[in-house]
Amino acid sequence: MLVSPTAAATSIEQQTIRDLRSIVPQIDNLNDGYVLRWLRAKEGRFDETAESLKKHVTFRNAWHLDKIEQWTPPECLEKYCGYGLLGDTEGRPILMSLLGNVDVEGLLRSVASLDYIKFSLAAIEKGMKLCEEKAKESGRPFEQMTLVFDLENITSAHFSCKQFASSFTTLVSLFQDHYPLFLRKILIIRAPEMARIAYASITAILQDPITRLVEMPSESDWKWSLAQIVNLDAWPMYWGGNLVENGDPKCPSRIKYGGGAVDESYFVDPKKAMADYDQLTTVYAGDKHLIQIKVKRPSRISWTYMTDEDDIGFEIHYDKTGSCDKLTEMETVYPYIRLECTNVPITGHLDVTDVGNYVLEFDNYYSWFSAKQLRYNIEIEDL
C-alpha cells in the first residue's frame, strides 16, 4: 500500500528530525513539516538530508526568500507576467502560470534574468505559505501545490530566445534543488506540437520525481483534466470553469493576465546600462576572476555586473580561518549561479556579520572557447 507523501511523521522520522536539528542549527526557524518534506525527498538518508538543508538555508539567505514579500519587483514583470493562485477541490493551492502569453524577448531586454527568476520564486513562496496555512487546517505535516502552465499564445521565441532558455533552465534547476516534494501535479495545457517537442528535449535536466508529475493533455482534453482537480463553479470560465467576474471570464482579481508585447520604453540599452563601472576585465575560457575582500565589521556587500556576450557564473566564499588556499576549502555564503547578463546587468547584495576574508568569484571555467569581457562594481558598506 502506497503511503501519502503528506502522511503524519512516524516515530522514527520524528526522532530523525530532532537529530537533524541538533547538528544543523541553521534550520531552527523551519517547522517540522518543512524538515520532514526534505527528509522524505531524500528517502530518509540522514547525511544527505542534513547537507541539503544546510545548502538550502544558504540559498534562502542569499536570495532573501524569508523576506521576499518586502521585495518590489520591476514594474515590467508585474505588468507583463501573468499568473494567479487559486485552489483545488480540497483547498490546496494551484499556481497558474500564463507562460505562453509572455513576450520573453521583450521581457529579458527590460529586466535582469535574476529578477525574472526571483519573480517566479516569489510566486512559489506565496504558494508555499498557502500550503502551510492549509496544513494547519488539515492537520497534515505539510501540503503540496499543483502547478498549471497555460501555453496559449506561445511562440517560437520561447524556444529560440537564448536569454529566456537559459533563465528558465536555471529556474527549473533551482526549483528541483530547493522545493522537493512541493508539487502534487504539473499540468501543461494548450500546448502546441512544438511545445511537446521542446518538453521532450528538456527531460534530460528534469529529475524523475518531477517528470512523474507532468501531465500534458491534448487540446480537446485539457478542460477535462482541470475539471478533475478543481471546483468548476469557483474556476474562471476562460480556463474551463463557470466563474465570471463582472462580465470578465478571465476573473482578473484571481489571475493577472499580463501578456502583450513589452513596450519598448522598458528596454534597457546595454551600451548605457553600465556606463559607470569600476572595473573591466576579461575572463578567459576555462578561467575564473577572483576578488578578495576584507570585512572588518558587519557589512553589506553589493555588486553589479554584466558581460559583453553570454553568461557568467558568480559565487561568494568565506574563509573562516583566514588561511584557506583553495575555494573548495571555504564556506559558500552565496551559492553559485550562472546567468545571462548581456542585455541587463545583474545587481544584488549580501549582508554578512562574520568578519574576515570573502572571495567573490566570476566563473568562466565551463566555457571551452569563449572569453567574457566583464564590467563590474563592488561596494562594501557598514550595516
From Swiss-Prot:
Disrupted-gene phenotype: RNAi-mediated knockdown in cells of the pi uterine cell lineage impairs basement membrane (BM) sliding along each other and reduces the size of BM openings.
Record's protein name: Protein ctg-1
Keywords noted in UniProt: Cytoplasm
Signal peptide: none
Residue intervals of the GOLD domain: 271-380
InterPro entries the UniProt entry points to: CRAL-TRIO_dom, CRAL-TRIO_dom_sf, CRAL/TRIO_N_dom_sf, GOLD_dom, GOLD_dom_sf, SEC14/CRAL-TRIO_domain
Pfam families, A to Z: CRAL_TRIO
Compartment list: Cytoplasm, Cytosol
Source domain of life: Eukaryota
Role according to the record: Vesicle trafficking protein. Functions in uterine cells to promote basement membrane (BM) mobility and BM gap formation during tissue remodeling.
GO CC, alphabetical: cytoplasm; cytosol
Organism encoding this protein: Caenorhabditis elegans
